[in-house]
From Swiss-Prot:
Name of protein: Inheritance of peroxisomes protein 1
Keywords on record: Membrane, Peroxisome
Main localization (coarse): membrane
GO biological process: peroxisome inheritance
Membrane topology: Peripheral membrane protein
Assigned protein family: Belongs to the INP1 family.
Claim: Calcium is one of the keywords in the record: no
Gene of this entry: INP1
Native organism taxonomy: Eukaryota, Fungi, Dikarya, Ascomycota, Saccharomycotina
Amino acid sequence: MARPTNSAASDVIPPSSKTRMPKIKPFKTIRTTFLKKKNTIGNLVSKGTHSSQSGGHKDSYMGDVESLTLRSPQSRGSWVESIDSKKIHSLSNDRVTLFRYEHVRVTSYQSVRKKYRNSGDSRRGQERMESAVKGTDVLRRERASVIEPRGPLEIYQIITPISKEPSQKVTYLCLGRKEQIIKPILPKLRITMLTREGLQFSVLSFNPENSWKIEFLGALGDSAVPCNVILAFENAVKNICRYTSELNNDPIEEVGTEDDDDLEYLLYSDFAEDDDTGSDITLNREHSSEPSDLLNCSTTNEMINDAFRKAIEHIRHVGSMPLIEAHGVKSFSSQLKIDGEQVDPPPKASPRQRAVSVPVETRTWSKLSTHPVALSTWMDIEYDDIKE
């Protein structure tokens, strides 16, 4: 028996068929993408026109887009090429080589600092490091490592042109055939020529812990370095950074023979002293009355000591004076006495003797001794106090 069929049931779409995606034709997809791009470009052009009208000035990029849309295809290609050439020319950098030498040995020195416990120890250690003299001695005390045993050294500049402004110049020092190490040469960089060790230069950067030593070597089979190489290196770095040479140090000033020496007058001046016999002793290098004492001196120091000793011998202390002179009458009068005889006073002196000084002995007690101690002194007595 045949089962009845329902025409309405045959027209119903099963639920699983609703989830299936409809087939999209390739032509419609390409057309839709093209229309979207066209609408995007139109929106950009309309926004640029609106902003230029409202702001009072037109953006350069949007103006270029408008002009590009209004030009023919041939003019568009030439315009794009001109823009690209301008951009390449503005961003191009020129490299200029200032110096290059193929045989150089470079050693890097790094100072070894101890780890301090507190800030006070680190400050004192830093002061000791700063007080040390910079030079080859400091380089020897640091840890050394060879960064270029034998290779080329090049100094070049990168010149960047800028429109309506002076071009920028940056100098670099390059080591190695493949430019493994590049170091900028700044105006504060210090390069010193180490003449005591040969054709060597020290390069001190901002960091005092790190420094380089550059040594120029001869070519293979030749130990001599041409002089023009050193001159070219000096001319290349002296106008860029701080370059100093030990040959330019101030010479040591020679000690003068007449004005600078404080004791020179003892050798060239005449000393006239009166002895018991009344003879004069003259100390002079050329005219000396005692050649056996002065001419036998081998050095200048001995001559100075001899002259100083002779000058001291003629200065007698008060305690070494004879007892007769110590107990004699010391007169402050204007009348002079020679060998007990009175001499006429000088014409400008007063004829009257005002006072005399007589020795006086006093006794005093000392804390260190139980016996009295006699003290000798002088007492001035005026003649007005003495009754005739």
